[in-house]
Design a protein with these regions (language model features):
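Conserved donor-binding/catalytic core segment of Leloir-type glycosyltransferases
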Residues: 1-17, 24-27
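Short alpha-helix at the nucleotide-sugar/activated-sugar donor binding site of glycosyltransferases
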Residues: 108
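Conserved acidic donor-binding segment of nucleotide-sugar-dependent glycosyltransferases
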Residues: 101, 119, 131-141, 149-154
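Nucleotide-activated donor-binding/catalytic signature segment of Leloir-type glycosyltransferases, i.e.
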Residues: 3, 38-43, 48-78, 91
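A charged, aromatic-enriched C-terminal amphipathic alpha-helix characteristic of glycosyltransferases
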Residues: 138-141, 155-186
Length: 197
């Protein structure tokens, strides 16, 4: 069912907004002869009018204030692709290279296919690529090409919905993480008790 709905939820600082503009531009070009994709952005961040104009044309792209997580989950259910993005500029690329955004876990758990658009050396991108849990785009030049590929072969979305869900269950199940954390804390507490006696 068209249009294919893409959703981004999170901060757009550290020049993530620039990556979102690349995506918005590609969508606008593809939608030239009819709406094939839409992009919804949910964020607490405020942007200037020039940026807002590029991210909120009310046809291809829609810019919204952040919403509570329970409401966001409903928006994910209405969407096809959840985005994870980082900036491509050198300074910001280096500042997030070793980080792993908790938003990745939200994306994997969203019920959507996940699309990562960032430098291939970024920690989250490398993880998603290794796990084959996301549609991975490592340069802005490939965004339009990938979206056209998805439009002509929408089964890619269902394949990556399944892969994202499987990765989330395999590696990020909340109960398992809580158990592991509890065990870690108990080990630390035990060691501290042992050494203080």
């Amino acid at each position: 069912v068209y249009p294919i709905k893409i959703i981004y939820a999170g901060g757009i600082y550290l020049n993530r907004w620039k990556t979102l503009i690349h995506i918005a531009k590609a969508i606008k070009e593809i939608n030239n002869e009819g709406i094939k994709f839409t992009l919804d952005i949910y964020t607490n961040n405020v942007v200037n009018k020039k940026i807002l104009k590029k991210l909120n044309d009310n046809t291809n792209c829609f810019f919204h204030k952040a919403i509570p997580f329970e409401q966001l989950k409903k928006e994910y259910l209405k969407s096809d692709i959840a985005l994870h993005v980082e900036s491509f500029d050198v300074k910001n690329r280096l500042s997030v290279r070793m980080s792993f955004s908790t938003k990745i876990i939200d994306c994997l758990d969203s019920g959507c296919a996940v699309m990562a658009v960032c430098d291939k050396k970024q920690g989250g991108f490398a993880y998603l690529k290794k796990e084959d849990a996301a549609i991975c785009i490592e340069t802005p030049k490939k965004i339009k090409w990938m979206l056209e590929r998805i439009y002509s072969n929408p089964s890619i979305i269902n394949d990556y919905k399944k892969k994202a869900l499987e990765c989330g269950i395999r590696n990020h199940k909340k109960n398992d993480i809580c158990k592991e954390l509890k065990m870690d804390f108990e080990r630390i507490a035990y060691k501290n008790d042992y050494f203080t006696d």
